[in-house]
């Protein structure tokens, strides 16, 4: 982005910017929990806290209690018995909150361009103009892909691209984005368009020097149905300075998401884990998401539709980061444990939890159904970002494969829409 681009605090509403500073949770300090017989007591207390929050959603957000109970849940030396206790507690809470049915969505990923002005330390997807492997799809190609997806029974198209400085119409980034949405809705009117991450929204706003509120409303009017909660990575300044110093700050991410929720657009929520972050930073991130969701509910908005744990894939990451992390693929045991921890810490605030077969592989994603997840994500039809990073899960899954994964866990399964409704019969 240009050095002359306005600061996020200048394009985001002042109220959202100030509130973001209060909603953003700092990692807790204090002594780390050692192996002790009290974990089961902490788990029971956490379940009680979650049930109380579910029954009394207007009560003050229990941040202090969440941090107090969450610290021994996150930062400890684990035994196999303790891991199993956490799994059982997460599975129990999942069943209480959303039942046993596993869901999935028939969708298609669309990546219009991998040109990007940022150079995040973990990204193998981005390219500069003229660089080998750079691509930019023509609008006609995107229309064709959307129409094909609708014809194949998809209910959703997911848009995600780099921050392409040349993606303009009449010199405007926003006009180009609006034209893209109009194209997609004309080509496939039944498809829900899920796109434009907080980073992309901020980029549009800064490049066109427009208030974020105007950008979001224009996109919504053009057909945008929901926003992916990507670019969150870990909502901690220390981590972001190490892996993505050019990206929007943690406070900016929170402020943008809050303003998107205010505009009536639901979003997903994410955590990219398994790299340089600590358990306490994971805990603070999850508490921030819960606080944001409670804020959305208080304001009468849907807020987050789901939480998606995104395990770090480093096979194609720069050598320094790969060396620091010490592995190229996710650690399944660590990610399953974090899946359960997230289910417990996100309490009643974020009901649906999705496992990522792209990053974990479908067998491990199915295993996550026993650790608190209730959703297997989408069919995708194609995928480039994680695959270019070296993910081993593949680029698409069939409905048969996703339903088979759920039934293999002896769970009922259903197709859903983006917002977890039932698809129309015509789709």
Label for each model-derived stretch:
Residues 1-81, 150, 286-290, 294-427:
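Auxiliary Fe-S-binding modules of radical SAM enzymes
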Residues 90, 120, 159, 227-230, ...:
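Conserved, mostly hydrophobic/aromatic
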Residues 102-110, 157, 193-197, 227-229, ...:
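Hydrophobic faces of well-ordered beta-strands that scaffold small-molecule active sites
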Residues 154-257, 261-268, 275, 295, ...:
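Conserved SAM/AdoMet-binding glycine-rich loop
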Residues 86-127, 134-160, 227:
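N-terminal pre-triad scaffold of radical SAM enzymes
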Residues 67, 107-108, 130, 160-175, ...:
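Glycine-rich, proline-tolerant flexible connector loops at the mouths of alpha/beta enzymes
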Residues 108-110, 163-165, 197-202, 231-233, ...:
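Active-site-proximal loop/turn and secondary-structure-junction residues that shape catalytic pockets
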Residues 146, 177-185, 216, 254-257, ...:
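Generic structural signal for well-ordered alpha-helices
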């Amino acid at each position: 982005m240009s050095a002359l681009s306005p600061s996020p605090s200048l394009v985001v509403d002042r109220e959202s910017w100030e509130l973001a500073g209060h909603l953003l949770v700092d990692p807790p300090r204090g002594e780390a929990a050692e192996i002790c017989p009290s974990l089961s007591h902490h788990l029971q207390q956490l379940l009680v806290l979650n049930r109380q929050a579910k029954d009394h959603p207007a009560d003050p957000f229990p941040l202090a209690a969440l941090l107090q109970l969450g610290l021994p849940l996150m930062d400890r030396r684990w035994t196999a018995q303790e891991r199993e206790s956490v799994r059982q507690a997460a599975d129990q809470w999942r069943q209480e909150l959303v039942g046993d049915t596993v869901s999935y969505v028939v969708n298609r990923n669309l990546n219009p361009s991998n040109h990007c002005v940022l150079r995040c330390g973990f990204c193998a997807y981005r390219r500069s103009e003229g660089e080998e492997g750079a691509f930019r799809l023509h609008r006609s190609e995107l229309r064709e892909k959307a129409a094909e997806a609708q014809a194949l029974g998809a209910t959703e198209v997911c848009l995600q691209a780099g921050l392409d400085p040349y993606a303009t119409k009449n010199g405007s980034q926003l006009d180009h984005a609006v034209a893209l949405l109009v194209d997609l809705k004309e080509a496939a009117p039944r498809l829900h368009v899920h796109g434009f991450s907080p980073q992309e929204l901020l980029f549009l706003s800064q490049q066109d020097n427009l208030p974020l509120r105007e950008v979001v409303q224009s996109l919504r009017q053009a057909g945008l149905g929901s926003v992916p909660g990507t670019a969150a990575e870990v909502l901690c300044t220390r981590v972001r300075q190490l892996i993505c110093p050019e990206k929007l700050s943690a406070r900016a991410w929170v402020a943008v998401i809050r303003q998107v929720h205010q505009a009536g657009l639901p979003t997903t929520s994410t955590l990219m884990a398994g790299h340089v972050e600590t358990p306490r930073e994971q805990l603070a991130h999850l508490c921030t998401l819960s606080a944001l969701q409670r804020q959305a509910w208080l304001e009468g908005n849907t807020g987050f539709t789901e939480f998606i744990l995104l395990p770090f894939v480093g096979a194609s990451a720069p050598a320094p980061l790969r060396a620091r992390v010490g592995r190229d693929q996710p650690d399944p045991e660590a990610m399953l444990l974090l899946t359960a921890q997230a289910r417990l810490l996100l309490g009643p605030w974020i009901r649906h939890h999705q496992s990522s077969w792209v990053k974990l592989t479908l067998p491990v994603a199915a295993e996550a159904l026993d650790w608190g997840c209730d959703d297997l994500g989408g069919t995708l039809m194609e995928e480039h970002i994680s695959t270019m990073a070296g993910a081993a899960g593949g680029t698409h899954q069939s409905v048969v494969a996703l339903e088979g994964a759920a039934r293999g866990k002896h769970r009922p399964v259903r197709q859903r829409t983006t917002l977890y409704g039932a698809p129309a019969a015509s789709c």
